[in-house]
């Protein structure tokens, strides 16, 4: 079986979708499947196309069906699909789901976001994380809060420093922003904070290993997204033992669990940080709860799910 995993972004760009593409390709190859990654569909022979992004993958899927009429299509939904493009009524994206042989989501809650008529085709495959050898080693001082991810409006990347800036009494707190400003507005905002707030440090885009090591030195990492399919940065922090404070959205709950205590709602970040700084919260408990969920996101578990899905598709194709 030949499988093409198509990303909506060039594979040279360090984005969540490209990381996902590379991970799936490696998983499939580990199962003996001839898999490759590409920027959209590359036109080469394939039995199955795994297309990331229902909306941005429309043209690639169309091209695949024209060139490989007997091929099967799996659409892997992203957070942008589920919480932005599809709810806003993307007809092309919805039709892509109707036409797909299978639809993959990374968490159960996502199924409720989809039209009833396509739900029977949905398979839940939690995204995995390769083992990370780096362990949390927070600095004694300052109390560093890491914010990891390329700044985009849906991630509310500057919410943490905006909150800290309202509290001059938090003298020992620093905010470490890790991620490349991909647009002029984000770069400008980051530079402005760097100039006016001495407790803010923007490291820009870093190689993954450097980003992980820096996050490991922080006392806390914050994910403040408005919408998120499931952040790699949250899984990475969990694996390293860095406490996670996260916005209460489906994407974060799908990773950390509904009963995880480290969530904040609208207007609650000040209070949560104050409780942490005052040591009224035991962050060690958060770490233990998060790490207990890591087996759900093991490479072995994800590999088994993908193999089962592809085997089922291959079997059904053989019955036609």
Question: Which ranges hold each PLM region?
Answer:
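A charged, aromatic-enriched C-terminal amphipathic alpha-helix characteristic of glycosyltransferases
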Residues: 16, 281-315
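Short alpha-helical donor nucleotide-sugar binding micro-motif in glycosyltransferases
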Residues: 97, 205-206, 213-218
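A short, active-site helix/loop in glycosyltransferases that binds the activated sugar's phosphate group
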Residues: 98-122, 126-132
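Conserved donor-binding/catalytic core segment of Leloir-type glycosyltransferases
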Residues: 136-166, 175-178
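Nucleotide-activated donor-binding/catalytic signature segment of Leloir-type glycosyltransferases, i.e.
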Residues: 188-209
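Aromatic "clamp/platform" in nucleotide-sugar-dependent glycosyltransferases that forms part
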Residues: 226
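Short hydrophobic beta-strand element within catalytic cores of glycosyltransferases
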Residues: 243-246
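Conserved acidic donor-binding segment of nucleotide-sugar-dependent glycosyltransferases
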Residues: 258-268, 275-281
């Amino acid at each position: 079986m030949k499988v093409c995993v198509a990303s909506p972004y060039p594979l040279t760009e360090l984005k969540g979708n490209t990381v996902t593409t590379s991970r799936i390709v490696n998983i499939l190859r580990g199962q003996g499947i001839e898999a490759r990654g590409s920027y959209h569909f590359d036109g080469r022979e394939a039995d199955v196309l795994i297309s990331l992004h229902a909306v941005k993958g429309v043209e690639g899927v169309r091209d695949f069906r024209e060139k490989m009429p007997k091929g099967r299509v799996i659409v892997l939904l992203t957070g942008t699909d589920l919480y932005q493009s599809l709810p806003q009524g993307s007809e092309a994206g919805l039709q892509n789901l109707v036409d797909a042989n299978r639809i993959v989501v990374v968490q159960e809650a996502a199924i409720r976001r989809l039209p009833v008529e396509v739900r029977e085709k949905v398979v839940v495959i939690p995204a995995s994380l390769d083992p990370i050898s780096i362990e949390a080693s927070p600095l004694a001082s300052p109390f560093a809060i890491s914010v990891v991810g390329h700044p985009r409006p849906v991630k509310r990347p500057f919410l943490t420093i905006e909150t800290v800036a309202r509290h001059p009494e938090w003298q020992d707190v620093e905010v470490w922003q890790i991620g490349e400003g991909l647009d002029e507005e984000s770069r400008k905002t980051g530079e402005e904070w760097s100039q006016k707030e001495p407790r803010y440090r923007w490291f820009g885009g870093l190689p993954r290993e450097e980003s992980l090591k820096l996050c490991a030195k922080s006392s806390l990492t914050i994910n403040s997204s408005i919408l998120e399919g499931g952040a790699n940065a949250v899984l990475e922090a969990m694996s390293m033992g860095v406490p996670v404070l996260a916005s209460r959205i489906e994407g974060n709950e799908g990773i950390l669990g509904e009963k995880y205590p480290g969530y904040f709602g609208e207007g609650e970040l000040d209070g949560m940080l104050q409780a942490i700084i005052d040591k009224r919260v035991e962050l060690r408990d958060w770490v233990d709860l998060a790490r207990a969920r890591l087996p759900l996101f093991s490479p072995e578990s994800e590999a088994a799910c993908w193999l089962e899905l592809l085997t089922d598709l291959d079997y059904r194709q053989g019955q036609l």
